[in-house]
Amino acid sequence: MLRIGLLTSGGDCQALNATMRGVVKGLANNVKDLEVYGFMNGYKGLIYSDYRMLSAKDFSGILTQGGTILGTSRQPFKLMRTPDANGLDKVEAMKHTYHKLLLDCLVILGGNGTQKTANLLREEGLNIIHLPKTIDNDIWGTDMTFGFYSAVNIATDAIDCIHTTASSHNRVFIVEVMGHKVGWLTLYAGIASGADVILIPEIPYDIEKVCEAINKRKERGSEFTILAVAEGAIAKEDAALPKKELKKRQEEIAKKYPSVSYKIAEEIEAKTGMEIRVTVPGHMQRGGSPCPYDRVLSTRLGSEAAQLILDKQYGYMVGMVNGKVKKIPLGECAGKLKTVDPNAQEVLQAKRMGISFGD
């Protein structure tokens, strides 16, 4: 008898269901007696023993289904060692649920915060496999996370649609793309859609340089400009502030503007006199059916996770490295953020194409 647990934690994205399907089908086709426990709403289900038994039927037809059949929630890693409102030790409660069900392995799907808790449980002696999920593609140790390319498709489509209206009305349009700390999604969607300016957290922008790029286009006869702006884009003068002052500055901006894009729009309008419009696709970027690439990626990652379980190899994240699915020790990757190198090939190639990063 093989008993495994599954949970999805953190923000949802495409291909969570497809990845769980890959794990379960990979095991079911190779194990005679298999029990699968699905923990509801992320780590909450593990903490409060909220789970249900899953059968093969539950994984039929979900390859193309967005969201997660188990539900999800955010349980910040920094609070995992803090007792809940009733004094419950959350870590001990998770261990108790795991041992009560006699699990051989717990498979955890999630992003950076989820991964840190997964590593904590590994350190506490549980058999853990982590599968990297996020539209941000910011998990260290894997070239690609499932959900990323699906989100790139959606963000690209949004910018493509804006192109037609921007060119018709001779306006400057800002499309705000998800990504508080890293700019992978904005970078790829910006390149894919032919954006004229890309602003990401890793490359602090100079508003004068941004306006210069817009004016240059106008001088060349282009009456419209498209900016792909990450929600975590930051001005050079703000990036130079000490941590406490930066936090205060960001709080001031948040009080005055719905998001950073509106601040940038106001500044560009004041300096150029051009009409600016802001579009925010928001949570649409996480929704819908996974793209074909993500369906393949999630199936491969899930299948490899199944093989690790069959081989009784635990304590790993399963990721993609140089086009091959690999196992990466959780202790090596947990807590590390994969950011965009300002000198990355993609950035330099985009600049060669005339795309401005405002630097």
Which residues are covered by each model-predicted region?
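Short, acidic/small-residue loops that bind anionic groups at enzyme active sites
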Residues: 31, 121-145, 199-206
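Accessory alpha-helical/coil subdomains and C-terminal extensions
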Residues: 97, 108-110, 116-120, 148-166, ...
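N-terminal phosphate-binding or glycine-rich loops at protein starts, especially the Walker A/P-loop
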Residues: 1-50
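Glycine-rich oxoanion-binding loops at beta->alpha junctions
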Residues: 48-106, 146-153, 157, 359
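Short glycine/serine/threonine-rich phosphate/pyrophosphate-binding segments
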Residues: 12-23, 46-47, 91-92, 103-119, ...
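C-terminal non-catalytic interaction/assembly regions of soluble proteins
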Residues: 256-359
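Short glycine-rich or small-residue beta-strand-to-loop segments that form or flank ligand, phosphate
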Residues: 3-11, 69-71, 104-108, 173-176
